[in-house]
Amino acid sequence: LVLGKAFHESKKTFLEIIQPGDTVWVIGGGTGAILPEILKRCGKNGKIIYMEASNKMLEKAKGRVSLDCQSRVEFICSEDFGLPNEGEIDVVITQFLLDVLTDHSINSLFQRVKQKVSPSTSWLFLDFYPVKDKQWLIHLMITSFSLLAKHPRKELPDYDKFFKNWDWGEKKAVSFEKGFYKAKLYRLAPKAIKSETISLK
């Protein structure tokens, strides 16, 4: 594989912040490689909402969940990121998702997430970044995806701009392959959190 072992290991970055009882929303999770690890961390009182646009990918992800854990995972096939009437989400996870979305779809995703989060929600983000010595590989990937899956982009998104515009502050970051892909932990910036007004009279 061109991307190697580090690519697969990167998907485990920051999963340790998931606590027993958490509700975790995985968006664009593909075949579910990280599902067993998330299940272990959120425990029997936790819940996973696993959203994927491809039915084929979703079926493969279901195969990674044992019978005794199936009640703890809700699988949703969706392209518009819409959730049913769930409670607040504790952890949002997007891994190698935003790079395949248009700017409009990215903003739609942030809008959907905003409706389901609280001040304590964490967002675990992982995606490719434009680095000089990997431009050929980025071009190859985007061109290949464009031909095979109608990839809408010609270049990688400005992820940092979107997180900043939607009031998410970066708390931690880990780079892989000299910055070719990065894992980041985000939380809502203080200005985005509605604080209660206390009147002292």
Give the ranges of each region predicted by the language model.
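A short glycine-rich, Lys/Arg-flanked "PGG" loop and its adjoining helix->strand segment in the class I
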Residues: 107-119
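Class I S-adenosylmethionine-dependent transferase superfamily signal
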Residues: 14, 38, 112-113
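C-terminal alpha-helical "lid/dimerization" subdomain adjacent to the S-adenosyl-L-methionine
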Residues: 126-177
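A conserved beta-strand element that flanks and buttresses the S-adenosyl-L-methionine
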Residues: 93
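Core SAM-dependent methyltransferase catalytic element
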Residues: 167, 171-201
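Helix-to-beta-strand junctions that scaffold the AdoMet/dcAdoMet cofactor pocket
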Residues: 43, 101-102, 117-119
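Class I SAM-dependent methyltransferase SAM/SAH-binding core
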Residues: 25-82
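Conserved alpha-helix/loop element of class I SAM-dependent methyltransferases that forms part
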Residues: 4-21
